[in-house]
């Protein structure tokens, strides 16, 4: 009987340890990156203010205050690949765009909580900056590498998404995210983007995440 009790106790301990090892859902500190994304800037006038798209990639770190609330810092670079745009009321074919850098601090809220959830969904909003980087092909748009370099704008974002965790690899997960980016006007910027009026953009991204600390 004693041997049976000892065996059952050992099984219970192993089961409990295994359950703890396979805890899914968000932890306390999380790092991640999104190698796949796109940002679509809208609100131009097809004259001096140009609509354009960029390929986005970035990284983020998240600290969870509670099961429902977290603070996130994120950084991204978006590459202005060649595309067709309208500028000065005429179409410009296959021209590269400025690269776009973004920096945001966001508050993240999980309405249903995040701990122990396989697919916790969230809403988020934050403030930061958007910077356009001049390149040789963007000289005609006023973004001359010799005179402008970088031009920065105060910006906000709101959005939401979902994180996906699996029991087989509980510390790793995936993330799908959407942000509506609001770029404030900067009167010192070239007319190409957000000089006389604010602009906006839609960013969609897909990434991976790792729970650094539970």
Residue positions per predicted region:
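Outer-membrane beta-barrel proteins
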Residues: 40-47, 80-86, 132-136, 183-189
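Predominantly the C-terminal beta-signal and adjacent terminal strand-loop region
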Residues: 80-85, 164-214
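Short glycine/proline- and aromatic-enriched beta-strand/turn motifs that initiate or cap beta-hairpins
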Residues: 19-64, 205-214
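Residues that define the transmembrane beta-barrel architecture of outer-membrane proteins
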Residues: 27, 51-57, 97-103, 119, ...
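Extracellular loop and loop/strand-boundary signature of outer-membrane beta-barrel proteins
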Residues: 43-48, 88-96, 141-149, 190-196
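Gram-negative (and chloroplast) outer-membrane scaffold detector with strong preference
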Residues: 20-21, 32-35, 60-142, 153-154, ...
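Cleavable N-terminal export/targeting peptides
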Residues: 1-25, 213-214
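Generic short beta-strand segments
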Residues: 36-39, 77-78, 179-181
